[in-house]
């Protein structure tokens, strides 16, 4: 899980999700692409 000020989709499988007012990126293909805004 990377914590970044600006989250971006890193591949075509990445999805931007908003949970509890935190923007996250989840990826089905590569778990290393997981990010959250912080």
Curated annotation (Swiss-Prot):
GO terms for biological process: translation. SUPFAM superfamilies: Ribosomal protein L36. It comes from the Bacteria. InterPro entries: Ribosomal_bL36 (IPR000473), Ribosomal_bL36_sp (IPR035977). The keyword Ribonucleoprotein applies. GO terms for molecular function: structural constituent of ribosome. One of its GO terms (cellular component) is ribosome. Keywords: Ribonucleoprotein, Ribosomal protein. Disulfide bonds: none annotated. Belongs to the bacterial ribosomal protein bL36 family. HAMAP family: Ribosomal_bL36 (MF_00251). This is Large ribosomal subunit protein bL36. It comes from Blochmanniella pennsylvanica (strain BPEN). The gene is rpmJ.
